[in-house]
């Protein structure tokens, strides 16, 4: 029986041949992963803690696993609209209700790493977006706009925050 060609099989083939690039933007989690510090009057988000359940020992002789405890805003994450008061009444405002297809799309990268390296409080403005579009073309609906700062190279809480 011949295999059926589907959009998914074509995507997989293009990925395997290196014609499409998927970029993993996640950062490793660890004890030094930065966590936002809020004023003391607000509840704090915990950092990452890992507790070993078993490590090939009497608690589990053939496996290694852990309990991981962290706030939902620790490390690389997505804020659903419901996270902010402005999104609490929107339809499909939680991660389980947002169609998965909305999380995948072509990306446009505005590289301001030099500026962010020179000015820690550098802000992306509409003028940066318009300049990028002037050089690369209009950002299409459904595209992701990524703002490159190279802050991912900063290690530890002090350097990042």
Label for each model-derived stretch:
Residues 1-161:
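Active-/binding-site microenvironments in catalytic and ligand-binding cores
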